Design a protein with these regions (language model features):
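Residues that form or flank phosphate/diphosphate-binding pockets in enzymes
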Residues: 23-24, 224
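Glycine-rich "substrate-gating" loop/helix at the edge of Rossmann-like oxidoreductase active sites
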Residues: 18-22
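Glycine/proline-enriched, intrinsically flexible loops and inter-domain linkers
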Residues: 43-262
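Active-site donor-binding loop signature of nucleotide-sugar glycosyltransferases
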Residues: 5, 17, 50
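FAD-binding beta-loop-beta segment adjacent to the flavin cofactor pocket
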Residues: 1-14, 24, 137, 141, ...
Length: 262
């Protein structure tokens, strides 16, 4: 099912691709009606939300995924299962190097991103099941390495935004729940509150300069969050720019971080 309001079109809603037909249509119709009338359904519908897909989901990708979904709809689906069909779609500059290092990739809003790294001498392929799989020990080793030493975390998946111009702080204060920073160099963590009072997202906002802010949030939910951003009228003096596709990055983490950077 692909459903929900189209972020780029005001007042335009979708509820399409219901394979089971009438067995789900009543419930999905109710959720759609609540979305239209109240601004949000009573249940979290992100798994069916059309905002999970962006401009990158072209016809070839759509055709491949639809065929795969239909062919596998009655199979047992395992936790953390990743489908290979239609991929890769988008690759970042570090992709080749990460693959060379044994990365097992997942799909995040069209991007290939490393989930974990297979040990040297083993095949970089993930197994699936309801018990501990082959990723458990490598992931455990990564966690211990970060806890006791130092490591690099690819944080390119995060959604990244620049907000600048006269009135930027006032506009952000209306969008998010927390008070945004008023001192240059300061940051704050803040939730984004939905229409029904639930948490629709969480962001880190940093003040880079006078009327200049940098905001980081979930990358896979960027198009989803656009709905909430557009609900608050933005002054013509405030410029809002998505930098998600233009910026990549790594986080240096662990007690020996300073040694690595030094």
């Amino acid at each position: 099912v692909i459903m929900g309001p189209v972020p780029e079109l005001k007042g335009y809603f979708c509820c399409n691709g219901i394979i089971p037909g009438f067995s789900q249509s009543g419930g999905l119709g109710l959720m759609s009606a609540q979305w239209i009338i109240h601004g949000e359904p009573e249940y979290d519908m992100f798994a069916w939300d059309l905002s999970r897909f962006g401009h990158w989901a072209n016809k070839a990708f759509t055709k491949a995924r639809v065929g795969d979904q239909y062919a596998n709809r009655f199979k047992i689906h395992f936790p953390y299962e990743e489908r290979e069909v239609g991929r890769p779609m988008r690759k970042r500059p570090a992709y080749a190097r990460q693959k060379e290092m044994g990365a097992v990739f997942g799909l995040n809003y069209g991007w290939e991103h490393p989930l974990w790294y297979a040990p040297a001498g083993t095949e970089a392929v993930e197994t699936y099941g309801f018990t501990r799989q082959n990723w458990f020990e490598p992931v455990r080793a990564e966690c211990l390495a970060l806890r006791n030493g130092v490591g690099l975390i690819d944080v390119s998946n995060f959604g990244k935004y620049q907000i600048k111009g006269a009135g930027a702080r006032e506009w952000l204060d209306k969008v998010v729940a927390n008070n945004v920073p008023t001192e240059i160099g300061r940051s704050c963590l803040t939730p984004l509150i939905g229409v029904r009072g639930g948490i629709a997202g969480d962001f880190t906002i940093t003040m880079l300069g006078e009327d200049h802010y940098f905001m980081v949030g979930s990358g896979i939910a960027e198009r989803y969050h656009q709905r909430y951003f557009k609900e608050v009228a933005r002054p013509t003096t405030v410029e809002f720019t998505s930098l998600t596709e233009a910026m990549v990055g790594f986080n240096v983490a662990g007690p020996k971080s300073r040694e690595l950077l030094g």
